[in-house]
Amino acid sequence: MFANNGGGVRGDLAAVVRAILLDAEARGPTKTAPDFGHLKEPVLIVTGLIRALSGVTDGANLEVVTGNLGQRPYYSPTVFNYFMPDAKVPGTAILGPEFGIHTTVTAIGRANLVYALVYGGYAPNTTIPTATGTRLFLQQFESLADNPAAMVTQVNQVLAGGQFPAALEPTIVTAVNAVAASSPITDGQRTARARMAVYLMASSYDYQVQR
């Protein structure tokens, strides 16, 4: 399209942008093929949760945390970035570059990272003026804590645009229902239920694999 916009014109950037945005892969339905999508990098998991949940961060501790998962920002081990472009999903012929830094250790580390973010965040760096630390805000889910099904549906909508598999929600609803709640429900119980829902969804591979 850059070389020829269809009318013999080279370098028509408007035509290039139009072709990208209107491409069938961009406009078509959600892809369901098992080999479609990619594993989110550790940094994208962190930034994605902070953005989706209106969080704040001063960056303190995150460099070390994501570094333990194989992706320390600004410290790529080679000129080829953090992983090789031809890396494959272990045991398959499917290209999955991000799996180049994915091991049994970092798989557990991902779940621990999500847990730390959801259940407390990271303290501010006291050497940085006006430091905020890293925190997520779950109030939009806490208000639905007395209706776990509605809460889980809202978490699904916020984290994945409602695209998580239908079978996932009932499982998480059961887990949220298992979090004790009195009548009337207390603020602490609302927070506990919201944390459970967000943690289970964000640590699942339905969230960590972007489609």
For each of these PLM feature ranges, what is it?
Residues 1-211:
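Flexible, low-complexity segments enriched for small/polar residues
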